[in-house]
Amino acid sequence: MIRAKKSLGQNFLIDKNIIDKIVNTVPITDNEILEVGPGTGNLTRKILENNPKKMYLVEKDTFLAKSLEEIDNERVKIFNDDILKFDEKSLSKNQIIVFGNLPYNISTEILSKWITNLKNDYWFSDLIL
């Protein structure tokens, strides 16, 4: 069993009903998806069932990023990186749907980073957090 690291503000999404509700909030098929903090990949796997065009996973925890490689899917690209330093705009020329079970300890910083740049750059179409 994988334990959440408090130092990284981790919390893992495991309730299948909540995962279903989250995934059903926006159309996923043929869209590009960025998932922030995919953790154990429960939400990732459900999103993949809905056939996104491409899926980008940004996971800071090296152990979890490595374990996500078990999701053997050509549409998935895994980045073992810190979302606060990550350049989301470099992923695609298209707008991306963002899913995230954000780490509690940096959620304000993440949102501030994204919202600050909204005036000049609309790199995402939806935020499902």
Protein language model regions, located:
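Catalytic cores of RNA-modifying enzymes
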Residues: 1-129
